[in-house]
Amino acid sequence: MGRGARLSELSAKAIHSQVVEVRGHIIDSQILPRILDDILDSECEFVIEEMRVGRTRGDPSYARVEITAPTAEALNEIVARVRQVGAQPVQTGQAKLEPAPTDGVFPLDFYSTTNLQTTVNVGGRTLAVANPEMDCGVLVEGNSARCLPLSEVRKGQMIVVGHQGVTVMPLERPRGPSSTFAFMSSSVSSEKPRAGLIHDLAREIRQVKSEGGKVLVVAGPAVVHTGSGELLVRLISGGWIDYLFAGNALPTHDIEWALYGTALGVSLTEGLPLERGHEHHLRAINRIRHEGGIASAVRKGVLTKGIMYACETHGVDYVLCGSIRDDGPLPEVCTDVIECQQAMRQRIHSGVRVAIMLSTMLHSIAVGNLLPAHVTTVCVDINPAVVTKLADRGTFQSLGLVMDVGSFLRELLDDLGRPQDR
């Protein structure tokens, strides 16, 4: 089939082999082609020993593939690679556990996680690994297993080592022509028709909210600079947003606009820099610090509009993470990166099912690294390199929309505001 049950004659030197199998909607979700491409890219060879293709849309397919490599090291490397997308060695056996040697250190051969749903076979029991996240270890405690960041491991905790007994579930494309977000993981392009994609996102948000799920927005200061802050305020006041993740810049420029009508000293109504406008952002930070923080400024009537005002008055939880380039920062900004990660993980694990990244490359990549693969993730930026980087850094499930953030928010609000779609 295609490249044949056998791509080429097995090399005389290729004496190391392993049989893997993969199940599910492996053809239309591009899982099997990706596995075969990975094998070829690694200069290994394959033989498809068995292939069963589902006859209807609801039927899963099955493939059993023998991988042959010239060395044991090459075989281990390619098997580990194809496991990341759902291929499993036949007879995986029991997972091996070793204690962490000290705080903040995994065993040397620890299993490094993906953001896909994963199970581990421990003592004859199959344990689902909670809180899927890339680049973590797997902690086993009693009858439970969960992803554990390196910074949180403590001496003596039992950590999965090697790949034996670990099963990764491939992320499959939704079934049927009406499936919401069947376009996930599509390539980035500024020429794609966006109206249908935004309509599908609005439908996904409605469904998630009706089922009690949470919607997360990760936003950069460009939302304010482009005059789109009021659009985000409308999303918040409409009850569509549950969490806001940002740095120091977004709230600073939002508050600068609320107090002075400028962002980075430029009037958002006239588009012109004002005299001494370059001082406004620092004066805004100082005023909020004087009032004791954002929440206090809202209670005292000092802050009466804007994104942060809307968050405070509509109960939207926010996490503000600082950086070394921040002025101030604002009192609510957390300057400990480990605490920031923990705060964001806590919100994500509380039921986030949709994440929308708005014009912030570094923050989007950071949050994307924390998200499970099943979270619907949309990255919006005018720069195609930004949305490409998010996928390249591991958040492969993300959809990139190359467009102005204001246009995106306006179209999304229009779709969410249609009475017949409520």
Model-derived features: positions:
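A conserved regulatory-domain signal marking ACT and ACT-like small-molecule sensing domains
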Residues: 2-99
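Gly-rich Lys/Arg/Thr-decorated short loops/hinges at beta-loop-alpha junctions or inter-strand turns
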Residues: 16, 175-190, 211, 285-291, ...
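Gly/Ser/Thr-rich loops at beta-strand to alpha-helix junctions
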Residues: 25-29, 51-56, 71-72, 166, ...
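Short acidic, glycine/serine/threonine-rich loops at helix termini
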Residues: 79, 132, 170-174, 227-231, ...
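Extended, charged alpha/beta regions that create polyanion-binding interfaces
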Residues: 82-179
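Glycine-rich phosphate/diphosphate-binding loops that line cofactor/substrate pockets in enzymes
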Residues: 200-215, 310-313, 347-352
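Active-site histidine-anchored catalytic micro-motif
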Residues: 215, 233-236, 240-286, 357
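C-terminal functional extensions of proteins
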Residues: 267-316, 323-354, 358-422
